[in-house]
């Protein structure tokens, strides 16, 4: 399991988050069948504040059931930030929401 790097900046940037997700991708792919992972929301818009959570969009190869809870916890442990996890399949039937997320998501 990838460990949180010791040199994590106190203030994450989108680039540092994407880099951390890229490093974690092989593990996430093997463990959770993650096809694609990206960041959207306040961090992408550089509007995050103290206590902001990190909005992460994940596309899976197949449903993982309750393992989604473990995925969220792993992402929080890897990044050291609270994560709001959104599954792409879960918002696909909400076209406006999907469009808004697609407009700003930055993939790892």
Which stretches of residues belong to each language-model region?
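Conserved histidines in hydrophobic membrane contexts and catalytic metal-binding motifs
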Residues: 39
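Short beta-strand->loop micro-motif that forms the acidic, two-metal-ion catalytic signature
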Residues: 55-58
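Catalytic core of pol beta-like nucleotidyltransferases
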Residues: 1-36, 44-50, 60-108
């Amino acid at each position: 399991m990838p460990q949180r790097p010791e040199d994590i900046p106190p203030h994450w940037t989108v680039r540092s988050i994407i880099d951390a997700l890229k490093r974690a991708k092989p593990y996430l792919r093997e463990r959770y069948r993650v096809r694609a992972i990206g960041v959207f929301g306040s961090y992408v818009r550089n509007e995050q504040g103290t206590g902001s959570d990190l909005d992460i969009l994940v596309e899976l190869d197949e449903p993982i059931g309750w393992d989604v809870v473990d995925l969220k916890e792993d992402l929080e442990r890897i990044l050291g930030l609270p994560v709001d996890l959104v599954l792409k399949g879960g918002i696909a039937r909400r076209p406006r929401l999907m469009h808004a997320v697609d407009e700003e998501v930055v993939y790892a």
